[in-house]
Amino acid sequence: MGGTASTRRVTFEADENENITVVKGIRLSENVIDRMKESSPSGSKSQRYSSVYGASVSDEDLKRRVAEELALEQAKKESEHQRRLKQARDLERERAAANEQLTRAVLRERISSEEERMKAKHLARQLEEKDRVMRKQDAFYKEQLARLEERSSEFYKVTTEEYQKAAEEVEAKFKRYEYHPVCADLQTKILQCYRQNTQQTLSCSALASQYMHCVNHAKQSMLEKGG
């Protein structure tokens, strides 16, 4: 127990199913065993691995190497974990950027559709306003035409009455003289025109004007002769 360093023989057992070596209850992979073999000094027979079976090392050295290899494996696992986390974060950022671009594209499309809808609505309002103005103007022109036709009809009625009155006066004054109807041809034409254009008497205004001029001229001539 004094000055001699104690050594213990440790047997490496292989797991046939998983290629795992068990050292004193610790399961080591083949990669860990290979690295432990490579890091062992080549001159020391007590610390060399000659094969998977029958190799012996000191207990303390074995614990140290196992701890180092486990720490290395843990570091590699942590590094791989961090790498995968980084990939996941990068993928999430890419997915978020793609979603943002898609959202913006959909928003632009909605804005464009809304602008087109507003333009179409504005154009429809303009067309409705133009149609309303045209209907109003049409009603105004029809009203003016009706008034002109009414005035023309009244004018014809007054002229006819005046002519009849003048004719009666002349007949009473000059009974002994034989006379013929004044402006008979124009009277016939204007009567015929009014019969043919009962809804558009304004078209006979030119004949009515000629007829009135003819009647006035006849009256003046009769008065001059009678005087």
Curated annotation (Swiss-Prot):
Query: What biological-process GO terms show up in the record?
Result: cristae formation; mitochondrial fusion
What effect on the protein does mutating residue 2 to A have, as reported in its record?
Loss of SAMM50-binding. Reduced affinity toward OPA1. No effect on IMMT-binding
Lipid sites, type N-myristoyl glycine: 2
Q: Where is this motif: Cx9C motif 1?
A: 183-193
Question: A cellular component term (GO) from this record?
Answer: mitochondrial inner membrane
Give the UniProt subcellular location, in the record's own words.
Mitochondrion inner membrane; Cytoplasm; Nucleus; Mitochondrion
Instruction: Provide this UniProt record's keywords sorted from A to Z.
Output: Acetylation, Cytoplasm, Disulfide bond, Lipoprotein, Membrane, Mitochondrion, Mitochondrion inner membrane, Myristate, Nucleus, Phosphoprotein, Repressor, Transcription, Transcription regulation
Any idea where the CHCH domain is?
Answer: 180-222
| Biological role stated in the UniProt entry | Component of the MICOS complex, a large protein complex of the mitochondrial inner membrane that plays crucial roles in the maintenance of crista junctions, inner membrane architecture, and formation of contact sites to the outer membrane. Has also been shown to function as a transcription factor which binds to the BAG1 promoter and represses BAG1 transcription. Plays an important role in the maintenance of the MICOS complex stability and the mitochondrial cristae morphology.
Q: What family does the Swiss-Prot or TrEMBL record give for this protein?
A: Belongs to the MICOS complex subunit Mic19 family. Metazoan Mic19 subfamily.
The name of this protein is: MICOS complex subunit Mic19
Per the UniProt record, the source organism is: Mus musculus (Mouse)
Name the gene. Answer: Chchd3
